[in-house]
Amino acid sequence: MKNQDQALIFEVTKEGRVGYSLPKLDVEEVKLEDVFESDYIRVEDAELPEVSELDIMRHYTALSNRNHGVDSGFYPLGSCTMKYNPKINENVARFAGFANIHPLQDEKTVQGAMELMYDLQEHLIEITGMDTVTLQPAAGAHGEWTGLMLIRAYHEANGDFNRTKVIVPDSAHGTNPASATVAGFETITVKSNEHGLVDLDDLKRVVNEETAALMLTNPNTLGLFEENILEMAEIVHNAGGKLYYDGANLNAVLSQARPGDMGFDVVHLNLHKTFTGPHGGGGPGSGPVGVKADLIPYLPKPILEKTENGYHFNYDRPEAIGRVKPFYGNFGINVRAYTYIRSMGPDGLRAVTEYAVLNANYMMRRLAPFYDLPFDRHCKHEFVLSGRRQKKLGVRTLDIAKRLLDFGYHPPTIYFPLNVEECIMIEPTETESKETLDGFIDKMIQIAKEVEENPEVVQEAPHTTVIKRLDETLAARKPVLRYEKLAPVQV
């Protein structure tokens, strides 16, 4: 069977074929009718695939070869920090004392796990400059929502019920206004200036007595450090608002600068990005939230505390916003992040930022002659290009991204941030070698030349992938959401 004709597992079924023989039943046999009501019992057998173990192995191995991950190739997805995840993290996460415990166990039986969580909180407090941290939130956007709910609780506790607006820059992550809306706020956009930074005059214009918070990423999504952050913090605080730090780009400032020292009141982190939890496949993530002292009473319960008798969860939190997740966060990702932090140490984390910034600036300068550079200045961990000159020749940024697939690269983030036309956002991370960067750069230059000399090659890409270009409009308007049974394929 050709690779492009890879069948679904349901299509390789052969009646009577089995993968395993089960041992004899060693407990009393029970009829389903004696356990479940008839409404919950199938009338007909489920149409499950009948395949051998070899069929299964070959099927899923073939599918895995179609996947692209950081272990298989360069993954320069801007604003996603697709760095290599050290495998020591996986070894530690599989320790029996971490992998084989249950969240409903008595606290006395999981003191080691609780100690790890407590120590991780302490490390994150030091890294961010916050006063305390909760590990409950499951991922970045969940952390955003949690942080905004804390800000809302703070204002309401102080009688400021009219603070209903959250300010976000025009370069913000899309989750920022979404999280604000879900938390019950109205979002107000502040413009960027010609340098790609928040326009201070526009910020002064939109800040008022209705301002609950300003949400920022620093460096911002253009990869630029908000150099006026202290003045911005003063503007917001003088108006009675809070400053929220989206930790998506923390990889750019590790051990170099701390959000708490910039004036931020709330911060969420992405342990699955900055601190090497594997991500990109839908989860799990971990989005701890750190706060300054005046927001501590509202943290979700329980909070993890250390006493002379060990570690325990404190549920006595009358002002807390409640729970934001069952139990206490995604523990497995927390173990991986803790392992990474302890392995790297302060000097190692500082080096992470130095190499991430160096790699990004190197790539930006090499690519600048071939693509438009909207903001011609040093970047931090990521940078944005524009495909405006290619668009004038009939080739879109989407076409460039598709062409990269032919060379085995995952495309960068495209069309984001929204305030850059034909945007291409590239984040190389610190874990990639110069040889890898040069290989990607060479292909980007090749594509730029193809646009000028043979644009059809780019417009019709990809050419070498199993699946060619999809009709994305048709897929959006007429999606096929259910499996449609076909005739069995002979293998």
UniProtKB/Swiss-Prot annotation:
This is Probable glycine dehydrogenase (decarboxylating) subunit 2. The glycine cleavage system is composed of four proteins: P, T, L and H. In this organism, the P 'protein' is a heterodimer of two subunits. Transmembrane segments: none annotated. The keyword Oxidoreductase applies. It comes from the Bacteria. It comes from Bacillus mycoides (strain KBAB4) (Bacillus weihenstephanensis). One of its GO terms (biological process) is glycine decarboxylation via glycine cleavage system. One of its GO terms (cellular component) is glycine cleavage complex. Keywords: Oxidoreductase, Pyridoxal phosphate. The modification N6-(pyridoxal phosphate)lysine is found at residue 273. One of its GO terms (molecular function) is pyridoxal phosphate binding. InterPro entries: GcvPB, GDC-P_C, GDC-P_N, GDC_P, PyrdxlP-dep_Trfase, PyrdxlP-dep_Trfase_major, PyrdxlP-dep_Trfase_small. Belongs to the GcvP family. C-terminal subunit subfamily.
